[in-house]
Amino acid sequence: MTGPRLPDGFAVQVDRRVKVLGEGAALLGGSPTRLLRLAPTAQNMLSGGRLEVHDAVSAQLARTLLDATVAHPRPASGPSHLDVTVVVPVRDNASGLHRLMAALRGLRVIVVDDGSAIPVQPSDFSGMHCDVQVLRHTRSNGPAAARNTGLASCETDFVAFLDSDVVPKRGWLEALLGHFCDPAVALVAPRIVGLHNADNIVARYESVRSSLDLGVREAPVVPHGTVSYVPSAAIICRRSALVEVGGFDETMHSGEDVDLCWRLVESGARLRYEPIALVAHDHRTNLRAWFHRKAFYGTSAAPLTVRHPGKTSPLVISGWTLMVWLMLGVGSFFGYLASLAAAVFAGTRIARALSVVETEPKEVAVVAAHGLWSSALQLCSAICRHYWPIAMIAAVLFRRARHAVLVAAVVDGVVDWVTRRGNADDDTKPVGLLTHIVLKRLDDIAYGTGLWTGVVRERHLGALKPQVRS
């Protein structure tokens, strides 16, 4: 994939999790993982994993590193806030809207009232110190249509979409706009955190495990990557790119943000997730409302599969690593032997792939072990989330399946608890391990219920189909 030239002064930094092989001859990492060989000239241009663009050659190398997802951008500057219009879709949330508007001082704002029972009036924002235009739908057409209405009235080069239940934190706009000095970038999203102090168990869980919070690590937004989409509760887009792909799909009532991200990627645009920028969201913390919302998110998988075949697969895994864990799950001597043989074969294939650069056996072993562990976590997650109805039936009928499901539920919950604990702020009381596992299981059951509901409604099994690669 190629793109427009990056400007001089633009820099990239190799991700610290990327493995440097053969004394700098190759980089192994990214999302999805790949091996990127570097010519001697390219090796010499990298200093401490950093590269600054100063000519056409360095610009091309920087683009290659970014597109290989092994490096992150360090832009020099970006557009001004004067180049941005904020679009706020709202329906029957006057208090949230006023709370948001108070944080948008000095910005141009278009409020799209999507059929509120009490219409939003321009006079509602007197004294807010921002330029506000109010548009109204006489009846609700959905958030996607409301965003498109706002987009059609924008004249600036960039448009920010903020839902009425969010509040951006100081410095959010500058941190996001910097990425647009790359002319290929069409969309940038902040990290979404909780708005209120966590005052119950669900709120404390959401503070570390919200579906909207994509974590503390910056990332490109690509299908099957660590960040495969970003929620439209808070995003900034290049208006021309958004208009070119037709804006939001108004026929979708869930997952329209995922659909937009993937259509932009398919058009050749680049998308970024920038967790330095923070936007607070008023999470649902009532257990019933929380469960229903998680299920609602799940219903989008099947319609997305129809529009983007292969991009919603619950499992993307090598056939040989899948064989390792399936044979291990058999639990017999033959199963253990077959699992060991499959692991050796998988390791041999990895060693052969890495043979293009000088690598030590220890490095090959580390890469192979990482691949096996990653596939194990994928399997545990898929069993408990996407395939839980099948897993429960199997657990009732077969003892070995029961043991496998129990192990998957515990491993997935423990690993999730360990990796997500760092997402909470200092004022939030941590959720205990057992409580986290229970809520994670409810989270997955809710999403899986919505997923299967969508599959039945669409009569399409694509959202359940794994991708097994050779």
From Swiss-Prot:
Transmembrane regions: 315-335
Gene Ontology terms for molecular function: glycosyltransferase activity
Main location: membrane
Domain of life: Bacteria
Membrane topology label: Single-pass membrane protein
InterPro entries membership: Glyco_trans_2-like (IPR001173), MftF (IPR023981), Nucleotide-diphossugar_trans (IPR029044)
Primary enzyme class: transferase
GO cellular component, one term: plasma membrane
Enzyme nomenclature, EC number: 2.4.1.-
Recorded phenotype for the gene knockout or disruption: Cells lacking this gene lose the ability to utilize ethanol as the sole growth substrate. Glycosylated mycofactocins are not detected in this mutant, as well as PMFT and PMFTH(2).
Signal peptide annotation: none
Localization, UniProt: Cell membrane
Gene3D superfamilies membership: Spore Coat Polysaccharide Biosynthesis Protein SpsA, Chain A
The keyword Metal-binding is assigned to this record: no
Protein's job: Involved in the biosynthesis of the enzyme cofactor mycofactocin (MFT). Acts as a glycosyltransferase that catalyzes the oligoglycosylation of pre-mycofactocin (PMFT), adding up to nine beta-1,4-linked glucose residues. Is required for the in vivo ethanol assimilation in M.smegmatis.
NCBIfam families: mycofact_glyco (TIGR03965)
Matching PANTHER family: GLYCOSYLTRANSFERASE, PRE-MYCOFACTOCIN GLYCOSYLTRANSFERASE
Record-given protein name: Pre-mycofactocin glycosyltransferase
Lineage of the organism: Bacteria, Bacillati, Actinomycetota, Actinomycetes, Mycobacteriales
Gene behind this protein: mftF
